[in-house]
From Swiss-Prot:
Organism: Haemophilus influenzae (strain ATCC 51907 / DSM 11121 / KW20 / Rd)
Keywords: Endonuclease, Hydrolase, Nuclease
Family statement drawn from the similarity comment of this UniProt entry: Belongs to the YicC/YloC family.
GO molecular function, one term: RNA endonuclease activity, producing 5'-phosphomonoesters
Co-factor requirement: a divalent metal cation
Protein known as: Probable endoribonuclease YicC
Key word Magnesium present: no
TM regions (residue ranges): none
E.C. number(s) listed in UniProt: 3.1.26.-
Purpose: Probably a ssRNA endonuclease.
InterPro entries for this protein: YicC-like_C, YicC-like_N, YicC/YloC-like
GO process terms (BP): RNA catabolic process
Length: 287
C-alpha cells in the first residue's frame, strides 16, 4: 500500500477526569516535520509523541493538537502556601505603613495567585490516558493516509496505462513514417534533378532513418512504465522513487518530441508530457 501525505483524523476522549480532543492533520512536505499544540501541563508529552510519529511516518508536515477540559473535583483538598501568604501579608503591611492608611484585607491575601490552590488531579494517569488515545488516533490517521494513497495509486496507474497506449501507437506508426520520409527525400532528389549514385542514396536513407528512429526511446518508455508499476505494487514510502521515475519518463518524451517529423507523433509526444505532468502532481502528495 502507498500512503498520501495529506490526511486528517480526530478523536474525542471522555474520562472521569474530564474530556479531551486529539487532532492530527498533515500536508505535503519533503521531509518529516512535526508541530504540536499542547496545553502547558502536558508539554512533557511532546518527545514521546514525536517518537511515535517518527516510527510510523517518513514524510509530511504533521500538526498535532490537544484540547482538554478537566472536571473540577467537588471534594478537592485546598493547599495553603503559607510561605507565599506570609510574603503577601508582609508586603501589604509595608504598603500600609508607607501609605499611612488602609487595612489588610484577608480576602485579598487569599485571592493572590498561588496562595490557595486546589489539589491537582493525577497528571500521570491523565497523561497515560491521553497517550493511549493518541495511539488509537494515529492508527486511524495512518489508515486514512492509506485510503487516500490508494486513490492516488489508481490515478497514477491510469496515466501509466495511457502512456503505454501512446507508446504502442507511435511504435505502430514508425514504419509508415519512415517510408513516407524515404519517398519524400527521393522526390526532392528527383525534383532537383540530381543524378546520385544509388549507393549514396541508400546511405542517406540509412542516416535519415537513424536520426528519426525512436525505437530506443519507446523501449525505455515502456521499461520505465513497468518499473513505475512495480514500485506502486511494492508500496511503502515510494514518493522519492516515483519522482525519479517521472524525470526519466520526461527525458524520453522530450527526446521523442525532438525527433518527431510527423504531426501524429508530435501529438503523441505532447500527450505523453501531459500524462507525465499529471502523474508528477499526484506524486507530490505521496509519502
Amino acid at each position: 500500500m502507498i500512503y498520501s501525505m495529506t490526511a486528517f483524523a480526530r478523536l474525542e476522549v471522555k474520562k472521569d477526569w474530564g474530556d479531551a480532543v486529539w487532532e492530527i492533520r498533515s500536508v505535503n512536505q519533503r521531509y518529516l516535520e512535526n508541530f504540536f499544540r499542547l496545553p502547558e501541563q502536558f508539554r512533557g508529552l511532546e518527545n514521546t509523541l514525536r517518537e511515535k510519529l517518527r516510527q510510523n511516518l517518513t514524510r509530511g508536515k504533521i500538526e498535532c493538537s490537544l484540547r482538554i477540559e478537566t472536571k473540577k473535583q467537588a471534594n478537592a483538598e485546598l493547599n495553603l502556601n503559607k510561605e507565599l501568604a506570609n510574603q503577601v501579608i508582609q508586603s501589604l503591611q509595608w504598603i500600609k505603613a508607607q501609605a499611612g492608611e488602609g487595612e489588610i484585607n484577608l480576602t485579598d491575601v487569599l485571592r493572590y495567585p498561588g496562595v490557595v490552590e486546589a489539589q491537582e488531579q493525577d497528571l500521570d494517569a491523565i497523561s497515560q490516558d491521553l497517550l493511549t488515545a493518541f495511539d488509537d488516533l494515529l492508527t486511524d490517521f495512518i489508515a486514512m493516509r492509506g485510503r487516500e494513497g490508494e486513490k492516488l495509486n489508481d490515478i497514477i496507474q491510469q496515466r501509466l496505462d495511457s502512456i503505454a497506449v501512446e507508446t504502442d501507437k507511435v511504435r505502430s506508426q514508425m514504419p509508415a513514417v519512415l517510408q513516407w520520409q524515404r519517398e519524400r527525400l527521393l522526390q526532392r532528389f528527383e525534383d532537383a534533378q540530381l543524378n546520385l549514385d544509388p549507393q549514396r542514396v541508400e546511405q542517406e536513407m540509412i542516416l535519415l532513418a537513424q536520426r528519426i528512429d525512436v525505437a530506443e526511446e519507446l523501449d525505455r518508455l515502456q521499461m520505465h512504465v513497468k518499473e513505475t508499476t512495480n514500485i506502486l505494487k511494492k508500496g511503502g514510502a515510494v514518493g522519492r522513487k516515483l519522482d525519479f521515475m517521472m524525470q526519466e519518463l520526461n527525458r524520453e518524451s522530450n527526446t521523442l518530441a525532438s525527433k518527431s517529423i510527423n504531426a501524429d507523433i508530435t501529438a503523441s509526444a505532447v500527450e505523453l508530457k501531459v500524462l507525465i505532468e499529471q502523474m508528477r502532481e499526484q506524486i507530490q502528495n505521496l509519502e
